[in-house]
């Protein structure tokens, strides 16, 4: 049985709650000693993992809608993507304000360049910023065919973000490996599309070099 528009609306409400509740928990944990011995790192990792969860959920929607024959599920994809960006912004903000501190924000640019895992993180965030800014139907109409080309960069984020996570932890634990494995699986479900994109980019690069 296919989902109705009303059911999808309620699903969106549930997904908004799923995006908001972790923030409420984090606020509670900060104020009631619910974090570990290094609360700054805990906040950074929590916000980063939550952003990654929403990224994976966003990537899950298209294959799930296709294989489950639930086309209306696609309507939830933008919502999940925006929550991914929101949590990624919290993640970046927590690093800038809590790790570096307000008085050392001038060092942020240097940190992002000299630490490779931070470079991957900021590249991912900039891409998510562009995708969030252009996620409306008005922007889709304005950009035309270029809209899909831009939003294909989400697949690059799906590669860079798990690497950023793996690189950022001092001791490799199962958790970042699980996230990386899920990202690989979700990308593998799109191997035909990704192969087509790769061949197109290679052809364009070859044509430019031939000029």
Curated annotation (Swiss-Prot):
GO terms for cellular component: plasma membrane. GO terms for molecular function: electron transfer activity; FMN binding; heme binding; metal ion binding; oxidoreductase activity, acting on diphenols and related substances as donors. Its cofactor is FMN; heme b. The keyword Hydrolase does not apply. The lineage of its organism: Bacteria, Pseudomonadati, Pseudomonadota, Gammaproteobacteria, Enterobacterales. GO terms for biological process: protein repair. Keywords: Cell inner membrane, Cell membrane, Electron transport, Flavoprotein, FMN, Heme, Iron, Membrane, Metal-binding, Transmembrane, Transmembrane helix, Transport. Belongs to the MsrQ family. Part of the MsrPQ system that repairs oxidized periplasmic proteins containing methionine sulfoxide residues (Met-O), using respiratory chain electrons. Thus protects these proteins from oxidative-stress damage caused by reactive species of oxygen and chlorine generated by the host defense mechanisms. MsrPQ is essential for the maintenance of envelope integrity under bleach stress, rescuing a wide series of structurally unrelated periplasmic proteins from methionine oxidation, including the primary periplasmic chaperone SurA and the lipoprotein Pal. This is Protein-methionine-sulfoxide reductase heme-binding subunit MsrQ.
């Amino acid at each position: 049985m296919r989902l109705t528009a009303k059911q999808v609306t309620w699903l969106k409400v549930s997904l908004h709650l799923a995006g908001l509740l972790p923030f409420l928990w984090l606020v509670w944990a900060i104020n009631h000693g619910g974090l570990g011995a290094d609360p700054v790192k805990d906040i950074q990792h929590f916000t980063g993992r939550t952003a990654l969860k929403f990224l994976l959920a966003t990537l899950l929607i298209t294959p799930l809608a296709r294989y489950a024959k639930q086309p209306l599920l696609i309507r939830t994809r933008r919502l999940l993507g925006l929550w991914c960006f929101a949590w990624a912004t919290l993640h970046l903000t927590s690093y800038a304000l809590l790790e570096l501190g307000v008085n050392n924000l001038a060092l942020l640019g240097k940190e992002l360049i000299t630490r490779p895992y931070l470079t991957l993180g900021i590249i991912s965030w900039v891409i998510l910023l562009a995708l969030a800014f252009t996620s409306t139907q008005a922007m889709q109409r304005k950009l035309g065919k270029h809209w899909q080309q831009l939003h294909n960069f989400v697949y690059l984020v799906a590669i860079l973000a798990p690497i950023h996570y793996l690189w950022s932890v001092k001791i490799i634990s199962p958790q970042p490996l699980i996230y990386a494995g899920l990202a690989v699986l979700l990308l593998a479900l799109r191997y035909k599309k990704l192969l087509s994109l790769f061949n197109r980019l290679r052809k364009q690069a070859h044509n430019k070099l031939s000029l």
